[in-house]
Amino acid sequence: MAYIAKSFYDLSAIGLDGEKIDFNTFRGRAVLIENVASLUGTTTRDYTQLNELQCRFPRRLVVLGFPCNQFGHQENCQNEEILNSLKYVRHGGGFQPTFSLTQKCDVNGQNQHPVFAYLKDKLPYPYDDPFSLMTDPKLIIWSPVRRSDVSWNFEKFLIGPEGEPFRRYSRTFQTINIEPDIKRLLKVAI
C-alpha cells in the first residue's frame, strides 16, 4: 500500500516549470485539483472552465491541473511540450492556462502521485456518480486496480480552506458547475 499523507498540507507537487508546489501555502484557500489531458475530447471545454473559475476567485481559489497519460494516452506530450500543445493544438488559438499545471504523473496504480493516493483515500468515489468506473477494461494500463481509481480524464477534487477534502466530481460533471460548492466553502453569497 502506498504511503498516504496525514494532511493535505503535507503534500506537494512539481510544477511544469520544475519548481516545487508546497500545499502548505494553500492554507485559507479552496483548492480544485483536476487530472487533465491535452488531447481529450473535452480538453477545450474543461481547460476553458478551469480558467474561468481561477479568474472568478483569483485570491481565494487555487486551481491545479495534473497532466496524466493513463487514459487513452491523451497526454502523450513531454512536460516541456504541454503548454505549446495547449496553445497551438488543442485547446489552440493561443490558449494559456491561468492556473498551475504540474508535471505529468500517474493518478492510479502502483506509481500514483501521493496527492491522488490521499484524495482517493478521503473521497473514494465521485458524489455525482458513485458507480463511476472505467468503461472499457481494455484501457486499464495500471496495477493494482482499485474501486476508488480515477476513471478518466478530468475528474475533479475540491478541498476546503481548512485543507479538508470536500467533494469529488466525475468526468461528466462540468467543471464550471463546481462554482456553487466553491462559493459555499468560501462563504461567498451565491
Curated annotation (Swiss-Prot):
One of its GO terms (cellular component) is cytosol. SUPFAM superfamilies: Thioredoxin-like. Disulfide bonds: none annotated. Its EC number is 1.11.1.9, 1.11.1.12. One of its GO terms (biological process) is temperature homeostasis. It catalyses: 2 glutathione + H2O2 = glutathione disulfide + 2 H2O; a hydroperoxy polyunsaturated fatty acid + 2 glutathione = a hydroxy polyunsaturated fatty acid + glutathione disulfide + H2O; tert-butyl hydroperoxide + 2 glutathione = tert-butanol + glutathione disulfide + H2O; cumene hydroperoxide + 2 glutathione = 2-phenylpropan-2-ol + glutathione disulfide + H2O. Mucosal epithelium of the gastrointestinal tract. The active site is at residue 40. InterPro entries: Glutathione_peroxidase, GPX_AS, GPX_CS, Thioredoxin-like_sf. The keyword Coiled coil does not apply. It is found in: Cytoplasm, Cytosol. The keyword Oxidoreductase applies. GO terms for molecular function: glutathione peroxidase activity; phospholipid-hydroperoxide glutathione peroxidase activity. Keywords: Cytoplasm, Oxidoreductase, Peroxidase, Selenocysteine. Homotetramer. Belongs to the glutathione peroxidase family. Catalyzes the reduction of hydroperoxides in a glutathione-dependent manner thus regulating cellular redox homeostasis. Can reduce small soluble hydroperoxide such as H2O2. Can reduce cumene hydroperoxide and tert-butyl hydroperoxide, as well as several fatty acid-derived hydroperoxides. Cannot reduce phosphatidycholine hydroperoxide. This is Glutathione peroxidase 2. It comes from Rattus norvegicus.
